[in-house]
A protein has these predicted regions:
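Long, positively charged amphipathic alpha-helical accessory segments at protein N-termini or as interdomain linkers
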Residues: 1, 62-93, 99, 212-232, ...
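Active-site- and interface-proximal helix/loop "cap" or "latch" segments in soluble metabolic
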Residues: 17-100, 301
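Contiguous, small/hydrophobic- and glycine-enriched helical/loop subdomains that border
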Residues: 193-240
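Structured beta-strand/loop patches that form or line metal/cofactor-binding pockets in enzymes
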Residues: 1-31, 234-241, 247-250, 337-357
Length: 357
């Protein structure tokens, strides 16, 4: 955390699946002062609120989240009950206050509905729109992907030869593309997945660890899935799962310009037999995930909901719009042209796809 200067601070954190935690405090001589915790959580006994405030007062403004949580926990009586939040949630809220983090309500949001593009254009557009948000030329944006041809999108740091079977890819006409974010490979055919990208200022996740930022940025998705009758959660670090199996995975890229990309692919109706012919899913990864078969690891949304892909997309768009007041927009011609240039100079070049052979 960067050095916290003296002055008033306000921080908020909505616990994924839990309650809102708010803190107002002063920083005096590098230490927390006049700390006031509030929120729509439940806490027993009443006196515990004052105990939490007292535990925070006097802490160094450079304290880590772990140190803050430990201070709160050590001050609480054994019979204290925290419902909808935790000492860790308090620590995150304090860190966000000290970092002068922004909240969802501080921004005007835009939604780009599914727009058909080549997969090369999609990964290039991710970089373009993140740069546009960083430059202030575009509001924070949620964009849904649409594509026609089968593709594999590998993570920025994955080995091409270790992740993709070239014979299988050629046999099934699969294009291999490398994205700018880390994480694992995505197998995508027309209509078989739901993919979206979020382009946000990093201030939105200031004070959050990388692990905490994933469920924080996808709380609206969990609400969407709940509306569809699916109880889903994050399985650290970046898998989205239900009690019937994995349904998706997320990846992030934080740009030096101050923006970040967060994107998710969820399986809708995957051809698992074809997937295992194209992707080389290592035994080590399957073992770590507690399963022996790649085909059994993924449980598509179509089977779990019985709904069309369009119905699921409509629910997701509606949920995000209602939750954050987002307005529909499109991709400008200038953004399209910049993406085309990036495809030609970077994303469709042998140097990029083979950057990790």
């Amino acid at each position: 955390m960067s050095e916290a200067h003296d002055g008033s601070r306000h921080g908020e954190y909505k616990v994924p699946g839990g309650k809102l935690v708010v803190v107002d405090l002063e920083v005096k001589d590098g230490r927390l002062d006049s700390v006031s915790l509030s929120g729509d959580f439940f806490l027993e006994p009443d006196e515990a609120l004052a105990e939490i405030n007292a535990a925070l007062a006097g802490l160094s403004a450079e304290s880590t989240a772990e140190q803050i949580a430990d201070a709160v926990r050590s001050r609480l009586r054994p019979d204290t009950v925290l419902f909808g939040f935790s000492p860790e949630a308090v620590a995150i809220t304090v860190r966000r206050a000290l970092a002068k983090a922004t909240s969802w309500g501080d921004h005007e949001w835009e939604i780009i509905p599914p727009t058909p593009l080549s997969t090369h254009m999609h990964v290039a557009m991710d970089e373009v729109l993140a740069e546009e948000v960083a430059a202030g030329r575009r509001n924070p944006t949620l964009r849904f992907w649409e594509w026609e041809s089968p593709s594999v999108v590998i993570g920025s740091f994955q080995s091409l030869r270790n992740e993709v079977d070239p014979d299988g890819a050629e046999r099934h006409g699969v294009t291999v593309v490398r994205r700018i974010s880390g994480g694992g490979a995505m197998f995508m055919e027309h209509g078989n997945a739901i993919t979206y990208s979020l382009y946000v200022p990093q201030s939105l996740v200031d004070g959050l660890s990388f692990a905490d930022s994933y469920p924080f940025l996808d709380a609206w998705v969990m609400e969407s899935l709940e509306r569809l009758g699916i109880k889903a959660w994050y399985q650290p670090l970046n898998d989205i799962a239900t009690d019937q199996g994995k349904i998706g995975g997320a990846a992030q890229k934080r740009l030096s310009s101050g923006a970040m990309l967060h994107h998710v692919t969820m399986s809708y109706d995957i051809d698992a037999d074809k997937m295992v012919q194209v992707l080389r899913i290592g035994k080590e990864k399957l073992s770590d995930k507690g399963t022996r078969s790649a085909k059994k690891r993924v449980d598509p949304l179509r089977r779990q909901t019985g709904l069309s892909r369009e119905e699921i997309l409509d629910t997701m768009i509606q949920t995000f719009a209602e939750r954050y007041g987002a307005q529909r927009t499109g991709i400008s011609e200038a953004e399209m042209e910049r993406a085309r240039e990036k495809v030609a100079s970077k994303f469709d070049t042998p140097e990029w796809i083979n950057r990790v052979p």
